[in-house]
Amino acid sequence: MPKFVQQKIVSKETGVNQEHPLIVGTSAGLVWFTASQQWIELEGHGVTAIAPSLNGLWVVVDGKSVWHRDCEGEWQVVAPSIQDLQLNCIQPLRGKVLVGTSNAHLFWIVDGGIEFIQSFDTAQGRDEWYTPWGGLPDVRSMAGGQSGELYANVHVGGILRSQDRGRSWQPTIDLHWDVHQVITVPDRPGVVLAATAEGLATSTDRGDTWSLDRANLHSTYSRAVAVCGETVLISTSSGPSGAKAAIYRRSLDRAGTFEKCDRGLPQWFSHNIDTGSLVTLKDRTVFGTSNGQIFLSEDAGLIWKQFASDLPPIHCLNFS
């Protein structure tokens, strides 16, 4: 069981809550920010997905393997490279860990073993999944609901839902909306949100029905979504290239009221603020960019400040 020593970068006041460090997955390691210190772990590795849990931290390393960090800071490889698949996203759920991959597969990590979910490979509508460039589809993001339901976002294949812990899967949304991220809202049972190429998609009935909101957006192409209290935030750009990217916010319950976040932010970003790069904790909202910047808001996205810069390209971030 290898243990990787924390390498300190700098000690200074960061403004991050001491109890919930900010963890940033970059192309060159996992960067930690506490209230007074910064350090890097897994140096030299690309960290492409992060998932905190009660028993530690789960990450995808170099897109190929799953690593676990226990509460003592020890790292262990729990799923090495698997069948030449790229591992895209990870979701701890009730003692197991769900992983989404390239070629649109899912598998569980259970007791150190790997169990592929065959029912997902035969899900209704799978033969219609595609990518805009003609390649094989991916599982891009996942979420868990309060009643035990699971949601898996296929790019491009919509959002599939399981209500029996992964034994069966059903499509829930128009797959042509091109979903990039799906999330649930912890204190809103039944609410599911998705960042799509057509704007923000919302369901209030666990995915049975959906509505789109794109009012006031400069463009509908959205890559990331998060909820901070009663506020929903999305990242939007002019398209896959990421030109004219921005963050928008609105009340969770008031469709049609998006406002562009501009206080403390550049007018536009030149690259997409991507899936997994926009996260919240209580009143705090944080996002990272592909050129190594982090921006922080302490009032649900109303006012922002640059929190860090000159990091390696950021793939994902989260609070522990």
Q: Each predicted region: which residue ranges?
A:
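Extracellular glycan-interacting surfaces
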Residues: 1-320
